[in-house]
Amino acid sequence: MRIILLGPPGAGKGTQAKLISEEFSIPHISTGDIFRANIKEKTPLGIEAKRYIDNGQLVPDEVTIGIVKDRLTKDDCDNGFLLDGFPRTVAQAEALDEFLKGINKELDVALLIKVPEEFILERMTGRRVCTSCGASYHIRFNPPKIEGKCDICDNELIQRKDDTEATVKERLEVYSKQTYPLINYYKDNGIISEVNGTESINEVFGNISNILGRDK
């Protein structure tokens, strides 16, 4: 089973990716993780990627594609994989398809977790983190017993910079510009499947499992 996981920031992709990986015994491949691994191991591609990152630049497609291709040749990908964070553009999607075709494989499904913008804004801007122990809360879904105070250590709770409304809206705008053409690309290829990401974790995973069961 070869899967692409798509969805906006705050859609719960990380949670679902872990569940899918465990249920279907395939590696969860996050581009962020493999970038960090290559940089840590000082591979040629990792060194090149670090140069762009250190200068505050986007890593070019050819470097990103090279790192992903290298990861997909590992033995644990023989029976499938779950890609999270790649591809981000149609050019990357085309390069991935070309690579898979070269090894007589193809994608089975592109899973899109759909969540309305207002739901994501509420989910992300409501998050709070303890400045001391790192415990996580949500002002609506998982509030602390005392407002602004950690239940565990009684220290202050803060909103991370990534979770401010302005930052979240900016991330959603970038996602829309990048990903809508990608969604249309996979629709044209007939492999996109959509799930409602506003439901509970178990309900979302149940719907995903039904889709993946059909596509086996």
Swiss-Prot record:
Keywords: ATP-binding, Cytoplasm, Kinase, Metal-binding, Nucleotide biosynthesis, Nucleotide-binding, Transferase, Zinc
Keyword Transferase tagged: yes
Superkingdom of this protein's organism: Bacteria
Binding site for Zn(2+): 130, 133, 150, 153
PROSITE patterns xref list: ADENYLATE_KINASE
Localization annotation: Cytoplasm
GO terms classed as biological process: AMP salvage; nucleoside diphosphate metabolic process; nucleoside monophosphate metabolic process
Enzyme Commission number(s) from the entry: 2.7.4.3
Substrates-to-products reaction catalysed: AMP + ATP = 2 ADP
Pfam family, one: ADK
Keyword Acetylation attributed: no
Function, in words: Catalyzes the reversible transfer of the terminal phosphate group between ATP and AMP. Plays an important role in cellular energy homeostasis and in adenine nucleotide metabolism.
Record note on quaternary structure: Monomer.
Protein name: Adenylate kinase
Lineage: Bacteria, Bacillati, Bacillota, Clostridia, Eubacteriales
Gene: adk
